[in-house]
Structure formats: C-alpha cells, structure tokens
C-alpha cells in the first residue's frame, strides 16, 4: 500500500515540524468487482508530421490485474521494465512474447523506475517510509529524507522519477505543499524546487539534460538545469489539449516531448509548440519509447475500479516515424 493508505501515516505526520494536509485518492468502484471490466477501446489515429503516420493503431502487448504497471522504461534487447505498485516488484517484459519476469523484489510499493545515462537504476518507493532506492550498480537506499524529516512530511505521495547523468535523481511528489519538484543529488541530499506545482506528476529530462519538464494538471512546466543539477527559470512550456491532466512523459531523438493525458498522448516540439495528439484509451497514464530501434511508442493504461479487485492494467504499443532518444532508457 502507498504511504497515505497506511494507518501509520498519522503518527509520522504528527511528528513533522509543519504537518502537511492529509492526502488521498478516492477509491473508485466498477460496476462489478467480481467480473473483469471490458478492456478500453483502442482508437485509430490521425497523422502527425514527422511523428506518426495516418491510420496506425495501438495494440495490447501485456495485461495484468491490479495497479501493477507504472513508471516504465525501455530495457535490454527491446524489452520493457516497469514497477509493480501493488506487488512491490520490478518486472521485465518482452513485448514480442508477452512473457514477464520479476527482476527486483521487496520495493516497498515501488511505483516508477528510471535508468540514467551512466547506467544507474533507481526506483521510487511509495510505501510508508517513502524513498528513492538505488537498484544498480549496488542496491541501497539513496534518498530517504528532506530537511532532516521523512519524505512524507512534504505531503502527498512520490509519483515519478528521472535519473540524470550525474548520478542524481529528479522526482515528483503529487500533493506536496507548494511544489512537488525535488532533486536528490549524487549524495542523496534532497532539495525542493519550483512554485505552484502541487500536482507534479510526469517528469522527464531533455536529451541534452539541460531542461527538465514536469507536468502539473493541464500545464507542462520547464526548468533550466544547471551544471550541479539545481533548477532555475521555471516557466510554462505548454498546455495539454488531449485529456484530463499530464502524467508520465517521454522525449524523442529530436527533443520533442510526449505527455500522457489520461486518454491520449500530446506531442510538443522542443520550443513548446503543440504538434498533435495521439488518441488512446481512457486511463492512459504513462508513455515511453522502446523496441530494438526505439521507434515504438508504448503506453500504460489503467481501467476498472481503482483500489478494488476489478482493477486492471495493460501495456499498449504503436509504431512511430519518430525515434525515441537513444542515449538513455527513457
């Protein structure tokens, strides 16, 4: 369970210097928790110049019960790695066969994974005692506190993360007080950045790692990244048009930004110009490039009743003309 669902969260927050407001996600209820809900409809698409040819369509490459597909990245030989939120595992899946295996266990409700250009692999852990854990090259706790207090004291819940080439990690906290944008430097010391970003969610670096993009509801913010990893010059990068609010994001080789919106993927040019929308099914909440040539756009989809036995996840894929950034996993 995530930290906010744990009864012990009250004791943790009571000890914070400035206790944050309680955080929660409403439990949704499907028509029946005994019968699997129907899979979402996968719509056809219109062309986006240089990105997507007309008439392409999504296909399902993997599905499973529960809230168990989140924070995915490309992995070796065209495979996909993702976090199992409910099961507290990290899995690796081959889209060509649909076969998956557990590669890391006991992640304390791990909700997203990220691998930097230097090969370091991290997972964001959403359970009580929230943290950023390093998985490779050596498994160990990387960041567990902010200003001497548990990460829970910032409010909300850890959502997404982005490892950089320095050995640090940017991460988002949805529901944080004031701003949910954080950076854990290579020593694991955490700093908070930004103003007016309480709904921070998807977080991604540009290919040259000089710009950090963060979604906040229907707005995508951009930050300049300094040489030491600190952030400056917060600004609005773009407004989403295709859905309900920004979530997991990706970049391609040309620096375009792809943002999951809840029912589509919105695409922006590097200067923030809106390029188009790739329609998808309801519940589309994350996207990334993968495949051996990184010309396949994958997306993760949640449907059914959140927090109920009817919850389902699936991974879908669509071929693109654009190529995902090849210099790192995502």
Residue ranges and their predicted role:
Residues 1-330:
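Sequence-structural signature of mature extracellular/luminal beta-sheet repeat domains
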């Amino acid at each position: 369970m995530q930290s906010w669902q744990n009864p012990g969260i009250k004791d943790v927050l009571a000890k914070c210097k400035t206790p944050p407001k309680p955080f929660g996600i409403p439990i949704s209820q499907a028509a029946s928790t005994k019968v699997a809900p129907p899979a979402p409809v996968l719509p056809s698409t219109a062309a986006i110049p240089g990105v997507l040819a007309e008439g392409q369509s999504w296909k399902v490459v993997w599905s499973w019960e529960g809230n168990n597909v989140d924070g995915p990245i490309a992995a070796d030989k065209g495979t996909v790695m993702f976090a199992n939120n409910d099961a507290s595992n990290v899995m690796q899946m081959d889209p060509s066969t649909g076969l998956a295996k557990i590669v890391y266990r006991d992640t304390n409700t791990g909700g997203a994974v990220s691998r930097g250009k230097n090969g370091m692999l991290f997972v964001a852990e959403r359970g009580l005692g929230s943290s950023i854990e390093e998985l490779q090259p050596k498994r160990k706790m990387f960041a567990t506190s902010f200003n001497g207090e548990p990460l829970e004291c910032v409010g909300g819940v850890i959502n997404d993360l982005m490892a950089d080439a320095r050995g640090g990690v940017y991460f988002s906290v949805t529901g944080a007080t004031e701003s949910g944008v954080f950076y854990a430097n290579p020593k694991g010391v955490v700093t908070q950045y930004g103003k007016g970003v309480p709904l921070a969610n998807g977080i991604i670096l540009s290919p040259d790692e000089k710009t950090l993009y963060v979604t906040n509801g229907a707005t995508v913010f951009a930050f300049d990244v300094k040489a030491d990893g600190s952030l400056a010059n917060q600004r609005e990068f773009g407004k989403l048009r295709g859905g309900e609010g920004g979530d997991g994001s990706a970049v391609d080789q040309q620096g375009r930004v792809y943002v999951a919106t809840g029912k589509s993927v919105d695409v922006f040019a590097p200067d923030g110009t809106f390029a188009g929308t790739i329609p998808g099914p309801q519940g589309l909440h994350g996207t990334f490039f993968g495949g051996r040539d990184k010309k396949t756009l994958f997306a993760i989809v949640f449907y059914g009743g959140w927090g109920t036995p009817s919850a389902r996840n699936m991974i879908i894929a669509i071929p693109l003309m654009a190529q995902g950034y090849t210099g790192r996993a995502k």
